Amino acid sequence: LSIQDVAALVQPSVVAITTEQMVSTNTWFGGSYVQSGAGSGVIISQDGYIVTCAHVVSGANNITVQLADGTEYTATVVGQDSTSDVAVLKIEATGLTPAVIGDSDSLAVGETTIAVGNPLGTLSNTVTNGIVSALNREVTVQGNDMNLIQTSASISPGNSGGGLFNGQGELIGIVNAKSGSTTNTGEATNAEGLGFAIPINTAM
């Protein structure tokens, strides 16, 4: 399949996620304010189950999911695991287009990868492509040591929770890190062309 074919195939399975969290202000007057966040997710069932990153939805009071066609739904968290940085959301919808789940254990370095997500929280359904740069890369994300797929596909804040697909359009990873992560030697990974994804076999 061409990258164009894969993009057309997988875009309906990727959603944009926006969150609102009530944050208490530690001032003498008390009070609180709403903090907004953004991320991405991947539909894994026709009836509204969506996989994303735990850090995207952690602590959120309100979660809104926007489908590729612009329809918005309120989502609830049905499960999350901060160690693997995976969360599952549920929206009340039917007839959705779930991603085809691939096998991340069969990936090879140099294979084509296509990342689809919502970079910067405003550019929903953005498609970038690259290759598998490395496998089983040890990266610390939000204090957790993880073995991740490294990809050269462009990853930006807001891509977290989006899909990393192979050349056949199968979901092989959940994008979860770019800038602000550190390698196991402690350097910050702000370099371009350096994105990471949770292998789908770990996430599922």
Regions found by a protein language model. Name each.
Residues 1-204:
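Serine-dependent protease modules
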